[in-house]
Every structure is written in structure tokens, then in C-alpha cells.
Design a protein with these regions (language model features):
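TPR/TPR-like (Sel1-like) alpha-helical repeat modules
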Residues: 126-128, 141-163
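A cross-family detector of function-defining hotspots
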Residues: 185-242, 246-313
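Helix-turn-helix repeat elements of alpha-solenoid scaffolds
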Residues: 5, 33-43, 71-85, 106-119
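Intrinsically disordered, low-complexity terminal regions enriched in Ser/Thr/Pro/Gly
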Residues: 8-9, 13-75, 284-576
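Structural register within alpha-helical repeat arrays
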Residues: 69-70, 103-104, 135-136, 170, ...
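Generic helix N-cap/helix-start motif at coil->alpha-helix transitions
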Residues: 60-65, 83, 93-101, 127-134, ...
Length: 576
């Protein structure tokens, strides 16, 4: 994302008393921001054009084409270092000056000197306690120490006045209208607001595999940056206003800059600020806040065309949708949840470009092992349940939990590639009386000559997603619970039929020009289990004539005296 001032606006010149120490610091800061512009990359042509969105004085657009952050010129680095030396010396004279403290932390962060920024934040002297904690949280977020950052920001929030605390806590700018309405309804109730915000940040957390909640700490880090820059000069050459507050809170601070010039290259026409090229919207839609258990994978997909907010996790800027399999296996008052995982292929814009991709450089994550996990967040406030594995990015994991309402997240992460995949959704599982037959979801597997006898033994064969190639044999597995309390005969029916047939095909069938495609069917009878226990079944399916398209495999269980139980799985067939 990029943003630019949509028109030239006069700024108010500050009257500085050069004999005043802070005045000297403010003059130096303004001079640095003015001088650094000459070292921004110069681009040809006008920056004016169609805006994806206008916010106050700013024109913003989301498709930046081939832009990527270039290394800063040495001259700009030297100017910043000169400024930092001056600010350090003046801070020694004014140890409790919060403005100086903020500028020092900010410019150290710009130079990627996060450890030094943290050191400065922790030696804040007599500055306001809440501001010291906020600067510490900002620095810890930059160091990817998200648990500690959250703790520091919590202290800052507690020490603020109520009005500022509410402004920082309630993320009005980054959520949709449904979310705003939901928050508005609970603002007068502290407990209800806390619960709703807890759900919001739980859903917004990019990866549960990574300790802490970096989307939450990034929100408070952005407020900290807005506070730092509000009382200082900036490269846009305009005064800070609500529009810059909003753009910073929604999309973060700039990672790079460009400038345009007039035809004669004599004056700067515009300064363009660029946000992270891989920013995605991790904030959940409002409808998912009140009933997270009903959220669909599409609701919680971190990738939208016109986002309300943008964020790119430092540990995995490329976080892609992962369309794995999810299957529920009810067992009375409990349920086994199975999720498959794999590392999605990087299909982002820059992957094939012949230029450095700095955000994918392994850096400190080089040598870290790949990992995957399945996470279940109970919505009754109980502790998160998880199963994780290290050293792999493809496979299947399962976890057994009490029936209830949950948010499920299956995740995989390659630290060295700084890439991750995620499927997140809500679900509800109700307890089933022990003598009521309950049919599980269908799980698609690779075929095997040795049929597994238990679900746990079948998991290594699970297909990473519900997809096969033309001519490929596959297998399905399922489970029935609630049997064995009486003698009975089970009738299973399995069918495979094509769905979403083309319009011409449907017209041809209606006019009887072409014959309708008949579902492939298979049925058999077998006795129920002699004792109460889950009944696991496995079936190889060899369907060489399936053409490319979408299909549904449907399973029906019929027993005398019981209602039919039905389960289905949609899958796709791709050309080889």
C-alpha cells in the first residue's frame, strides 16, 4: 500500500527559541526530515491519479505494482545518526522529557536498532509512566517479543486516563460497520467490552504457532508511533492530523519512501509513503465477533481486496490461505477434530521478480525448524487445546476435546522461508447420547493395501487437501459412534456425483441432447459392532473416468428404527 498527500497544503511554521534545549532538538528534528527527502528514490512521472481510497488529505492505493523497499542511502543514515547524537545529549539535560524520549526510540527503530530502542525506553527517567510503558511495548514488538510487548502495553493502558485508554483499546478504524456496531453496543459495560475485545484479538492473531499476539501488539505499537510523530515534523511536509492517525492505526507506519519532481528536477512535487508490500487484513468481520463459532474459513481469511487494515507479521509476511481438510469425529460427549496442513506455494507478486525481497530474508530465523499445529480455542474461556509437530510442514494432526463451541486453526510455518499457511474457522459440536448413531465427516486419504483399523492409524495417509488428479485412486474414511448397544444391521451407501456442471452441459441435459451424468453408487450391509465403541471404516475408490471438475462424495447410513445419517465431502479433480 502507498499513500500521498492529495494536494499541497500550507503548514504552520513553529517559532523556536534557539536558546531552549528542547527547541534546539525540535529544530534539528525538523531539519533532518526536511533534508532526508533529497535522498528518497526519485520516480518519473506524476504521482497523481485514481485513488483506491481518500482519507482526509491523503490519496491511497493498494496495488503498488513492483515497488519494494530499497536500502536507505548512506547519506540519510548519517543524517539520522547526527540527529540521534544530538537528541541523546539533550536528553541528558532533560531526562524526563517524553517528547525527546519518543523521538530517540522512533529514530532508533527506523535504523532497525531495536535493542537500543528498548534500552532507551527502559531508562525513561521521570517521563510519564504510561508513556514509558508504551515505548517499551513498541520496542519489544519490534524485537518480536510479543508476550512481553503485550504486558508492557497492558501497563500503559492501565496508567492512561479513561478517555485515551478507550481510544487506544477500541479499534474503530480497523473493523467493518458490523464490528463497530457490536462494539458500540457494549461500550458502556466494561465486562462485555473486555469479552468482545478478547474475541476480536483472538480471531485477529495471525498464527497461534507463534507465542503472543502480534496483531494486537502491532495495534498499540501503531498508536505509540502516532503519538511520537504527532508532535514532530514528517516527510510529507504537513502537520500531523486525524487522517495520519487513521492511516497509521489501520495500515502501520511507512517502510519506504519515494519522491516525484517537476519536469526540471528542481523541486519535489510529492512524497510517497509506502507500507509493507505483503500487508493483509487479519481483523475479523463484525459478524464473527458475537458468534465466533459460526465463522467460516472465508470470514477469517487474511486476504481481501479492499482491506480496512493491513499488517504483515515479521516472522511470516507471506501468510497464505491453506485449504486443507477438516473433519469432525463425534464420540458421545467428546469430539475428535482432524486437520490437514501443508505449506502453500508462494504465488505473491514479487516471488518471480529479479530483485531483492528483503522481507523474505531468513535473518535470525535461518536454521529454525519448520512447524505445524492444530489449535482449538474454547469459547467458554477454557484454555486453548493444541497438538503440534516440529520439522514438518505437511501432514495431519488430531485432537480430542469436550463437545462445545470452538475456533479451530490449522497452521503451518516455515521460519526460514518466512512463509506460513492457515485455515481458521469456527465450529460447534453438541454432545450425542451414547446410544444414538452419529456419523462423522468424511476424510479423504491416499489408498493403502493395508487398511487401517483405527482413525489414528489412518491419519498419516490423509490427503493434504480434498483434491486429486484425473485417474488418481483415493480412499475415504469415516467413523460411526453410538452403536453396539443392540444387535442391528447397518446399510452403507456411497455415491460420487459431479457438482457445478457447466451451463452448456445443463442445457444439453434439459433438452435431452446429452445424457445426464449418473452418480456412481456403491452399497453394502454389515452387522453392527457387538460392543459399544466407535466403528471405523475405510474404503478405496478407484474412479479412473472422473474428468476435471468438482465432485461430492456422499455417505448415507441406514439402520432400522433410526433416522438416516448423512455425511458428504466436496472435492476437486485436476488435470494431470
Amino acid at each position: 500500500m502507498a499513500q500521498i498527500v492529495s494536494r499541497e497544503i500550507d503548514t504552520v511554521a513553529a517559532v523556536i527559541d534557539s536558546s531552549d534545549s528542547q527547541g534546539i532538538a525540535r529544530t534539528a528534528q525538523a531539519r533532518f526530515e526536511r533534508r532526508r527527502i533529497r535522498y528518497f528514490p526519485l520516480i518519473l512521472g506524476s504521482a497523481s491519479g485514481a485513488c483506491d481510497e481518500r482519507v482526509g488529505r491523503f490519496c491511497s492505493w493498494y496495488d503498488e505494482g513492483d515497488w519494494y523497499p530499497r536500502p536507505e542511502l548512506v547519506q540519510a543514515e548519517e543524517l539520522r545518526e547526527e540527529l540521534l547524537v544530538l537528541l541523546d545529549s539533550i536528553q541528558a539535560l532533560l531526562p524526563g522529557d517524553g517528547w525527546l524520549l519518543g523521538q530517540r526510540v522512533w529514530y532508533l527503530s527506523e535504523a532497525r536498532r531495536w535493542e537500543e530502542a528498548l534500552e532507551v525506553a527502559r531508562s525513561c527517567g521521570t517521563a510519564e509512566p504510561w508513556w514509558c510503558a508504551a515505548l517499551e511495548g513498541f520496542s519489544l514488538h519490534g524485537l518480536q517479543r510479543y508476550v512481553e510487548a503485550d504486558q508492557a502495553f497492558s501497563i500503559a493502558i492501565d496508567r492512561m486516563d479513561n478517555e485515551q485508554s478507550l481510544r487506544w483499546r477500541v479499534p474503530r478504524w480497523v473493523i467493518d460497520d458490523d464490528g463497530k456496531n457490536a462494539l458500540k453496543k457494549v461500550e458502556t459495560s466494561s465486562e462485555s467490552l473486555d469479552n468482545l475485545l478478547e474475541h476480536l484479538w483472538m480471531l485477529a492473531d495471525p498464527l497461534y504457532l507463534v507465542e503472543g499476539n502480534d496483531r494486537k501488539t502491532s495495534h498499540y505499537a501503531r498508536w505509540t508511533v502516532a503519538k511520537i510523530r504527532k508532535e514532530a515534523k514528517n516527510p510529507y511536509r504537513i502537520s500531523w492530523g486525524n487522517d495520519l492517525d487513521e492511516l497509521t492505526i489501520r495500515h502501520g507506519w511507512e517502510l519506504g519512501w519515494d519522491r516525484t519532481s517537476d519536469v526540471g528536477f528542481t523541486t519535489v512535487e510529492h512524497v510517497i509513503g509506502h507500507k509493507h508490500p505483503e500487508g493483509r487484513d487479519y481483523m475479523p468481520p463484525g459478524k464473527a465477533l458475537t458468534t465466533p463459532s459460526l465463522a467460516t474459513p472465508e470470514d477469517l481469511r487474511a486476504d481481501v481486496e479492499r482491506p480496512r487494515s493491513l499488517y504483515a507479521p515479521a516472522y511470516a509476511p507471506v501468510l497464505l490461505p491453506m485449504e486443507g481438510q477438516v473433519a469432525l469425529f463425534p464420540r458421545g460427549s467428546r469430539v475428535v477434530v482432524v486437520g490437514t496442513h501443508f505449506l502453500p506455494e508462494d504465488t505473491t507478486r514479487h516471488v518471480g521478480h529479479n530483485h531483492p525481497i528483503p522481507w523474505l530474508d531468513p535473518g535470525t530465523q535461518d536454521g529454525m525448524l519448520d512447524r505445524a499445529g492444530i489449535f482449538l480455542v474454547p469459547l467458554d474461556g477454557a484454555r486453548i487445546k493444541s497438538a503440534q509437530r516440529i520439522g514438518h510442514t505437511e501432514g495431519a494432526l488430531s485432537i480430542e476435546v469436550p463437545s462445545g463451541s470452538y475456533v479451530l486453526s490449522t497452521e503451518t510455518w516455515s521460519p526460514s522461508k518466512r512463509r506460513a499457511g492457515r485455515l481458521r474457522m469456527g465450529f460447534e459440536s453438541r454432545p450425542v447420547p451414547e446410544d444414538v448413531a452419529s456419523l462423522s465427516d468424511i476424510l479423504m486419504l491416499r489408498p493403502s493395501s493395508e487398511e487401517p483399523e483405527l482413525l489414528e492409524a489412518a491419519l498419516p495417509q490423509a490427503l493434504k487437501q480434498a483434491e486429486i488428479l484425473t485417474g488418481q485412486t483415493f480412499a475415504i474414511a469415516w467413523e460411526v459412534s453410538g452403536l453396539g448397544f443392540r444387535s442391528e444391521t447397518l446399510l452403507f451407501e456411497v455415491s460420487v456425483s459431479q457438482i457445478n456442471r457447466g451451463v452448456l452441459r445443463q442445457i444439453g441435459e434439459f433438452l435431452r441432447i446429452t445424457k445426464p451424468t449418473r452418480p456412481l453408487r456403491l452399497s453394502w450391509e454389515e452387522p453392527g459392532p457387538p460392543n459399544p465403541s466407535p466403528l471405523f471404516r475405510y474404503l478405496n475408490l478407484d474412479l479412473p473416468n472422473l474428468k476435471a471438475g468438482k465432485y461430492e462424495v456422499r455417505l448415507v447410513l441406514k439402520t432400522v428404527g433410526r433416522a438416516d445419517a448423512v455425511s458428504a465431502r466436496v472435492f476437486s479433480v485436476q488435470e494431470r
